[in-house]
Amino acid sequence: MKIITCYKCVPDEQDIAVNNADGSLDFSKADAKISQYDLNAIEAACQLKQQAAEAQVTALSVGGKALTNAKGRKDVLSRGPDELIVVIDDQFEQALPQQTASVLAAAAQKAGFDLILCGDGSSDLYAQQVGLLVGEILNIPAVNGVSKIISLTADTLTVERELEDETETLSIPLPAVVAVSTDINSPQIPSMKAILGAAKKPVQVWSAADIGFNAEAAWSEQQVAAPKQRERQRIVIEGDGEEQIAAFAENLRKVI
């Protein structure tokens, strides 16, 4: 059983600065980290490994220079995967969901897999598209919002997901792609033994050419900016008479 767990390196949100002049975001001082939602996918994959005989877990990521960071690689491997594959290319530095999914699908085909796990979305964009797009590209079943994995056999994965007013149980034929929600588990903090052992695990570095990926016309991101902030007027209207109500209504009209 070959399980691939996908993850994304994202900027640490606490280090992102806002340029007051135009509202643009400054990522220059933000360190990269594993997307919080993908930590759940990594944990789920490693829990499945304990259930399936001879299962192997491969962590897979696509991106730019952030994936060259040795500390980041060690962090991923310390959480349980047996090996790591990173696909690094400058064109993937700010990849949007369609391109990311295309590269992940190509890399997964090259590596071989029975099951692909990923988080429902990423901590930065949270587009909630990549998992379903990977399934579409590979022409295999894809399910998102999975909150529980019930069982895994050689050819079927049984899962649950919470809908608005019911719990849905699904049996998914393998191979398949499953995007998990944060309800599925609580990611463990790696032990010192796991951290030290991570340095001995294999890491494969692939380029776009290695997976046969040709640059495609992708949607381009036009702008990422913080919302404009309005200065508060600090208008306080005291009382509940007709004059105060009229004044309140008049001020509402000015901002609507």
UniProtKB/Swiss-Prot annotation:
Gene3D superfamilies, sorted: HUPs (3.40.50.620)
Keyword Transport: yes
Keyword Transport: yes
Pfam families in the record: ETF (PF01012)
Entry's Gene Ontology BP terms: carnitine metabolic process
Keyword line: Electron transport, Transport
Pathway noted in the entry: Amine and polyamine metabolism; carnitine metabolism
SMART domains tied to this protein: ETF
Listed GO MF terms: electron transfer activity
Source organism superkingdom: Bacteria
Alphabetical list of InterPro entries matching this protein: ET-Flavoprotein_bsu_CS, ETF_a/b_N, ETF_b, ETF_beta_N, FixA, Rossmann-like_a/b/a_fold
Family of the protein in this entry: Belongs to the ETF beta-subunit/FixA family.
Quaternary structure annotation from Swiss-Prot or TrEMBL: Heterodimer of FixA and FixB.
Its job: Required for anaerobic carnitine reduction. May bring reductant to CaiA.
HAMAP family assigned: FixA
PANTHER family: ELECTRON TRANSFER FLAVOPROTEIN BETA-SUBUNIT (PTHR21294), PROTEIN FIXA (PTHR21294:SF17)
Descriptive protein name: Protein FixA
Originating species: Escherichia coli O45:K1 (strain S88 / ExPEC)
